[in-house]
Amino acid sequence: MELRHLRYFICIAEELNFKRASEKLFIAQPSLSQQIKDLENELGCLLFSRKNRSLTLTEEGKQFFLDAKHILDLSKQAIHNVKTISDAKKNKLNIG
């Protein structure tokens, strides 16, 4: 599982529509559907319930949504923290 899978899942979960999510993510709908199918296979459960062209999150999907958002937030924070340290080192003035 890669961070992109989490981003794809979150977008679909927020849109509750594969077509709109694929347009928002700039990825072909069949490819996005396959990515989610692969993710569900890896997790061993369905994340979405698909009935009569309606898409809803399963109980597992609801929990995964919360966890995936948390993981992406932590990832963004980690990147920010490293860049802050790196930028501070670049701007450090050494005298003597």
Regions of interest found by a model, annotated:
Residues 2-5, 29, 54, 61, ...:
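The N-cap/first-turn positions of alpha helices
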Residues 7-10, 34, 49:
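Base-recognition residues in the alpha-helical recognition helix of bacterial helix-turn-helix
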Residues 83-96:
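Interdomain hinge and pocket-entrance segments immediately C-terminal to HTH DNA-binding domains
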Residues 42-43, 64-86:
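Alpha-helical linker/hinge and terminal dimerization helices associated
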Residues 10-31:
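Short helix-boundary/capping micro-motifs
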Residues 40-60:
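A short LG(V/I)-centered, amphipathic sequence patch enriched
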Residues 15, 24, 37-46, 79:
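Residue cluster at the C-terminal edge of the helix-turn-helix DNA-binding motif
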